[in-house]
């Protein structure tokens, strides 16, 4: 049986943020499902399915963390013990590629470009998890650096390569792409900073504040992202996002 402080309130009372995160993700998922309930167009359905999956996976992750699952202790070689919610990384390993897939479909990016982008993204998440679980501080910061560099590649690829594909899209699709791209650029850039100043890095922010920050970032990058995407005329009608050509998909 899980200790009360882990199963309900968390290690430092951060359970309140995990509960709010769970509710926020569930509400977002229900909203997306209700909005897409009567959608018949296959291309529109694709956006709804992906966005609902993102919210559902995130809700499951937050709920598991609230009940104390996906939480472990990492004892460093210097004796410092860190409480780590590794379930975040399991969440991100699935949801970040889906977010990129959503925006890639909107932009009309080729399958090859999206495969490259998602591969780099997965590498970013895995090396971030490695940084979190390493017991030697130098190794932790080394893998954090590698993960951050990978993130910069992801953001660069999103702006330059996917952005170029979006330039051929309709005006409405371009406008929506620009907003979603900026959400990803700002929110994702904050994640490694949050790691660095939080309990997994320098310890300048406790687990309570760190969990609050991650919750805000997650809700913005997932539910906020989905809300804007699925309200766009490029998705719901009146304008259409491009689809990758057969030549671009090669």
From Swiss-Prot:
The keyword tRNA-binding does not apply. One of its GO terms (molecular function) is photoreceptor activity. The record marks 91 as: Primary proton acceptor. SUPFAM superfamilies: Family A G protein-coupled receptor-like (SSF81321). InterPro entries: Arc/bac/fun_rhodopsins, Rhodopsin_retinal_BS. GO terms for cellular component: membrane. One of its GO terms (biological process) is proton transmembrane transport. Induction: Expressed constitutively throughout the growth phases, both in presence and absence of white light. The covalent binding of retinal to the apoprotein, bacterioopsin, generates bacteriorhodopsin. Belongs to the archaeal/bacterial/fungal opsin family. Light-driven proton pump. This is Bacteriorhodopsin-II. It comes from Haloarcula marismortui (strain ATCC 43049 / DSM 3752 / JCM 8966 / VKM B-1809). The gene is xop1.
